[in-house]
Amino acid sequence: MQDSVDLENNLPEAKELLTEENLKLELSHSGLREIAWIFNDKEIFTEENIQALQLHPKPMVLSETIILLHKIGILNQQNLKIVLSHSELEIVNLMLNTLQEVGIFNQESFEKALSHQKLKPLKLSLYYLQEAGMLTQENFEHVLSEQEITPIALSLRYFQEAGMLTQENFEHVLRHREPVCIVFSLRYFQET
């Protein structure tokens, strides 16, 4: 009986401990345990790396990205530093997951994707190509080579929304001297 009284008396204190912030902290620490195991396996378990993980503003996204790099077999100190310092980690994570889903994620595609100047339009382009079943190594290379990728991404979006994203239409967009004109045309037809 005494135990139940003590439990009831301490219940408000226990409820105070179970806050959203504490729950997030516990989840991030459990993710950190898995990452620490991976780091140990890859011989990159250092105080500096663990501290960088703990202080990162987006620990869950960082953990997912590290696990993905490990899964693909390209987790090393150099790639870890790139990921830790990247300002658009959420976009990087989504893009790498897209590449991994279609089987074209490797060290080379990692370096090419992360060195691209416009990550958000690149991620969107890859997403729409994947949705249409057209994300191949060749199409990935085509998208990477484009200087003006934003109109490409928008064109792919409008073609996808209209159910007309085909390899032929994709190649037409790539060949067009002013892909932004395609965007305006597709948008006009979509609105009418």
Regions found by a protein language model. Give the residues of each.
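Ankyrin repeat (ANK) tandem alpha-helical domains that serve as protein-protein interaction scaffolds
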Residues: 1-192
